[in-house]
Amino acid sequence: MKPAYPPLLLQMSPAYTPRPLKNLFTANQCWAHLLEEGGLRDIEVETVTKMLACGTSILGVKHYTCGNHSCPHVKYLCNTCHCRACPSCGKKATDQWITVQNNRLPDCPWQHLVFTLPDTLWPLFFYNRWLLDALFRLAADNLIYAAKRRGLRVGIFGALHTYGRRLNWHPHVHLSVTAGGLDEQGVWKNLSFHKEALRRRWMWLVRDYLLGQPLSQLTMPPPLAHILCESDWRRLILAAGGQHWHIHLSKKTKNGRKTVNYLGRYLKKPPISGSRLAHYTNGATLRFTYLDHRTQAYQQETLSQADMLFRVVQHIPEKHFRMIRYFGFLANRVCGQYLPKVYEALKMATPGPTPKLYFAPMAKAFLNVDPFRCVLCGARMVYTAAISGLTVQGLNLNAQAIAQMRYVKP
């Protein structure tokens, strides 16, 4: 079936070089071959197809004409995909999230924590991704419980990461918590956490949660294929990890900006940056460098192009899964009630609304060129029409054709 492209046809130009991540997928038609083989999740196909079509007329086009009626200049701007796996769209989403958080977070000491799982349980969460949803709640409950015992309400925001530095499957939870909280009288009091107590309770909470899941509802990964009955399941969970349930507590910081900037770099973008793929020359294999946290030395790993693609797409979250969540007085349900009290207790001015980021100011700041200024006469470009692009259903139907377009230029 021929792809049903929008009215504005694509111009194919061998002089155009796609971004490194797009090039990784389209070189040697590797992604197209993987689509033919099948076995990919629906969300992986949908997200990658959106990313490959981003910035082309496939997603639709906005038509601008010069405000000076005697000027013939016309400009077309192609729509973007707004998906998390896109390195282009991730920049705006990242900056917007960081701006919002830095504006509203209380100006007080914060502490960053990382909750990890034993590697024997990693495959279980890979084959049963719905289990990931509870990790947020279990990790946050650990901190809320410790604060509640002291009569305090803390603020927490967190993110789920599913990848390690080698892009392998390694689910873990990042949480940032205020190093203090509100008591019942609305007074702010400092708070510290005991690492070993947190570790033991984290281990108990995860084990208790997993033991509560019916074995019939779980998909057992190949390494755990021998688990056939409830007693085997219970034995596995109670023995998993031994003492290798780790929690990392960073040093307290004077505010939450450092953590916000750190998490923002990873949450709205692909798991690997384009700069780490810039050296890729369309070969059958590629080599990438990563920092080994055990040896604190840089290591190199060589992978086939297909293996690298599998490592990237496995970290695409399921549809509607929220990778960032808020708890305590930052929870969406109660933040309107408690944040004003927190600002008052910390003697902070109530922050105003966060300015929204738009394409034109960002482009002007980066390129030093106003995208809506006519290049011929200097007048303002005026929006006049739009050409609709493919819907999500249309993108999925044309995924194979889009994957085969190596060089795409609108």
Curated annotation (Swiss-Prot):
Domain of life: Bacteria
One Pfam family recorded for the sequence: Zn_Tnp_IS91
Single GO MF descriptor: DNA binding
Keyword NAD: no
GO BP term, pick one: DNA transposition
Keyword DNA-binding attached: yes
The protein's role, per its UniProt record: Involved in the transposition of the insertion sequence.
Full protein name: Transposase for insertion sequence element IS801
Organism annotation: Pseudomonas savastanoi pv. phaseolicola
